């Protein structure tokens, strides 16, 4: 017999958008929940995101008059991902409308469509995008929870947002207010799930630890929902998975460094896929502003060791904007983005020369040949190669055609590029000094590797059987998509499979 300290129907580990969706779904079914958050603030990794959510075919797209549908979304995923995860792909797109319908029943939660193109040219793609976003939130609407949300990414607002509003991923804290309104929850900050409690092969609870005490929490349904972040902040686990880059380069919050001891029969973790790149702070921690690539039209990214230009205005592909695949193990970094003064002027203040952001390395002015020789700290960088490629960009600008990288031919390119007076808005010549180089390293916001699950989020053993009572979603689980089909797929899948897990537990 276990000596239990507290009880609930559903124990939720983590407080990001996916975890909170699972908690709210359970509460809506009449189940009691305890939400454990490792840090002292709620919101998780999703609070650091722009909160685009890839939930296709919902009432939100219908309100916006978009010709979106579950079938179109299914076709798009199948064209990109194949049949390897067809059941989970189907569960994802078929459940998305129900998730949104449930959440919008609560007066605290409302979504809207915001244009952001799907990333790849494939059957079912929507050039306008199909992602939805939570409406900006007035902190007064959620009371004390506003002060318990993950803090702003930076101390200074550089994007002219309305003062006092909770925007982007922080607006998803509204889901926690919805959970709280059910009176069937208990939020527990500064609480680490240090181990799972197993009886006769079934997960029946967990050991909660915080700076003051330890508790044995029983899930009355014999259920634990594990949605507590990935392993991007754990250097040892990254090395075991063969994940490129360093833990200190991750852009995620400090919480996702798994401390839970799992039953030995758990399935192994899948190999992580590199999701994106970012600018790195001088002190080594990844910068919170990650849109430099999207804002610079006329740049070159030169990688190691041969000064090879890489595409700047680009979708988020299987290969990163460095031209480095996950199998390259990060050998192409650091890279340097080279651009001229017009891009500095046109960039938002987060990448401004006159107001350099304190959270990124300051660009270095100088002529292109001088810059490449004196400022790019690798002996194998060749100034003549960089100058040659700058002249090539000039020719592309005059022609309006990028024959090598095809910039400006994809709707995603056009989305980020306002008119520049030329035939191709994605091409701006590198000719107006001073010139700049921004150091670029691999980075990530989370992991795609994790616990292998079925369509209802049940964690699977190595032999494919389900572990009774254990569910996983979000960055804890292996992704349904080995790469990034569109804006908000990680958050969308986290919400859908947390919803499906809670529904399965409520049966």
UniProtKB/Swiss-Prot annotation:
GO cellular component: plasma membrane
SUPFAM superfamilies hit by this protein: FAD/NAD(P)-binding domain (SSF51905)
Subcellular location: Cell membrane
Record Gene3D superfamilies: FAD/NAD(P)-binding domain, Succinate dehydrogenase/fumarate reductase flavoprotein, catalytic domain
A matching Pfam family: FAD_binding_2
Record membrane topology: Peripheral membrane protein
EC category: oxidoreductase
Biological processes, Gene Ontology terms: steroid catabolic process; steroid metabolic process
Keyword annotations from UniProtKB, A to Z: Cell membrane, FAD, Flavoprotein, Lipid metabolism, Membrane, Oxidoreductase, Steroid metabolism
Any GO molecular function: 3-oxosteroid 1-dehydrogenase activity
Pathway entry: Lipid metabolism; steroid degradation
Highest taxon listed in the record's lineage: Bacteria
Stretches for region Disordered: 299-385
Catalytic activity, reaction form: a 3-oxosteroid + A = a 3-oxo-Delta(1)-steroid + AH2
Keyword Cell membrane (UniProt): yes
EC number: 1.3.99.4
Keyword Oxidoreductase carried by entry: yes
Cofactor dependence: FAD
Induction: By steroids.
Binding site for FAD: 9-38
UniProt record similarity statement: Belongs to the FAD-dependent oxidoreductase 2 family. 3-oxosteroid dehydrogenase subfamily.
Protein name: 3-oxosteroid 1-dehydrogenase
The species this protein was found in: Rhodococcus opacus
Taxonomy of the source species: Bacteria, Bacillati, Actinomycetota, Actinomycetes, Mycobacteriales
């Amino acid at each position: 017999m276990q000596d239990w300290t507290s009880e609930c129907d559903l124990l939720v580990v983590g407080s990001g958008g996916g975890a909170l969706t699972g908690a709210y779904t359970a509460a809506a079914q009449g189940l009691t929940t305890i939400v454990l958050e490792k840090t002292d603030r709620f919101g998780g990794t999703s609070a650091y995101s722009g909160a685009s959510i890839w939930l296709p075919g919902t009432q939100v797209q219908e309100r916006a008059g978009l010709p979106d549908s579950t079938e179109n979304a299914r076709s798009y995923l199948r064209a990109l991902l194949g049949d390897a995860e067809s059941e989970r792909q189907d569960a994802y797109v078929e459940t998305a409308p129900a998730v949104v319908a449930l959440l919008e029943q609560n007066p605290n939660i409302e979504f809207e469509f915001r244009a952001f193109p799907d990333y790849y040219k494939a059957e079912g793609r929507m050039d306008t995008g199909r992602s939805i976003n939570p409406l900006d939130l007035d902190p007064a609407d959620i009371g004390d929870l506003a002060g318990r949300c993950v803090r702003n990414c930076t101390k200074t607002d550089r994007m002219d947002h309305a003062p006092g509003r909770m925007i982007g991923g922080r607006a998803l804290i509204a889901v926690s207010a919805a959970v709280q309104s059910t009176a069937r929850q208990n939020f527990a900050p500064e609480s680490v799930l240090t181990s799972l409690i197993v009886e006769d092969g079934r997960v029946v609870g967990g050991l909660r630890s915080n700076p003051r005490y330890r508790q044995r929490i029983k899930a009355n349904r014999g259920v634990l929902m594990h949605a507590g972040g990935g392993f991007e902040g754990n250097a040892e686990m990254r090395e075991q998975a063969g994940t490129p880059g360093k833990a200190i380069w991750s852009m995620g919050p400090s919480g996702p460094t798994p401390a839970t001891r799992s039953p030995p029969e758990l399935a192994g973790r899948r190999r992580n896929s590199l999701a994106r790149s970012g600018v790195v702070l001088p002190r080594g921690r990844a910068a919170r502003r990650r849109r430099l690539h999207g804002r610079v039209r006329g740049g070159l990214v030169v990688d190691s060791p041969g000064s090879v230009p890489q595409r700047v205005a680009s979708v988020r592909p299987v290969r990163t904007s460095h031209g480095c695949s996950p199998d390259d193990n990060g050998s192409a970094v650091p890279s340097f983005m080279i651009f001229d003064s017009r891009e500095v002027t046109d960039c938002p203040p987060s990448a401004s020369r006159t107001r350099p952001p304190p959270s990124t390395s300051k660009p270095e002015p100088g002529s292109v040949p001088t810059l490449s020789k004196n400022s790019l700290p690798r002996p194998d960088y060749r100034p003549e190669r960089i100058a040659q490629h700058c002249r090539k960009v000039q020719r592309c600008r005059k022609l309006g055609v990028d024959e090598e990288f095809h910039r400006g031919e994809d709707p995603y390119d056009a989305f980020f590029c306002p008119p520049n007076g030329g035939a191709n808005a994605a091409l701006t010549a590198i000719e107006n000094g001073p010139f700049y180089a921004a150091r670029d390293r691999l980075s990530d916001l989370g992991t795609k590797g994790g616990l292998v699950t079925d369509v209802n989020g049940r964690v699977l053993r190595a032999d494919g059987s389900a572990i009774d009572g254990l569910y996983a979603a979000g960055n804890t689980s292996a992704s349904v998509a080995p790469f990034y089909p569109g804006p908000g797929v990680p958050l969308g899948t986290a919400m859908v499979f947390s919803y499906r897990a809670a529904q399965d537990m409520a049966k």
